[in-house]
């Protein structure tokens, strides 16, 4: 038995790893996920907006290369907003983002029977990076005079009374780059003082922790793990939960085989 453990056929390991990844993705076998403090803070802020029947601004600042991490996050947030009748205005500050933003808005909007122009609006892409954020804070309609299809904002019931960023009860940036720390915080939140939070790729999350400590951000969703935690809070397990469960099960299987191999090695030395 000890000798067998020390010489396990690699194909057996591959089969176990395959099953560990396939079960969550194909059979919806999920591991429990415990939401962290920063994710709960974002959820609670959206709940405060819902209590006041408020309006939020979602900024899409990611592209196709980070879709696997960011799109599940957007889906979970929109499900929360639409299930609680929160009004959503969406903008894009990355040129790759409009297609992804429109897709998820229409998908989740149809899921909850939401009406465009009344429950949500999509204003499309605007070039300029931080200058757009600054412009939205001064005169929102100067930055975005019309929606993605050319309809003036004053003709949409949802955006008729929106003048500046201060008219939003909450601003949330879905970021794959540096838009949170270099655009939204210095030129938006710090200047105009609105409640702000963000979601980012996992590799970016540590860079944003100082903004949580300084209270410039209400909370933070970091990568696929943050999206999975938010799905848990919303009560709808989706792609993020499946992806994190697949990763976790694969890691557990690999660690188990490492432990078995080391145990077999030390036991063989005793003989």
Residue ranges and their predicted role:
Residues 5-6, 258-271:
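Juxtamembrane interface at the cytosolic side of transmembrane helices
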Residues 65-121:
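Membrane-embedded segments
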Residues 11-26:
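Hydrophobic membrane-insertion alpha-helices, especially the h-region
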Residues 210, 214-248:
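Short, aromatic-rich amphipathic segments at membrane interfaces
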Residues 2-13, 246-249:
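N-terminal membrane topogenic signal
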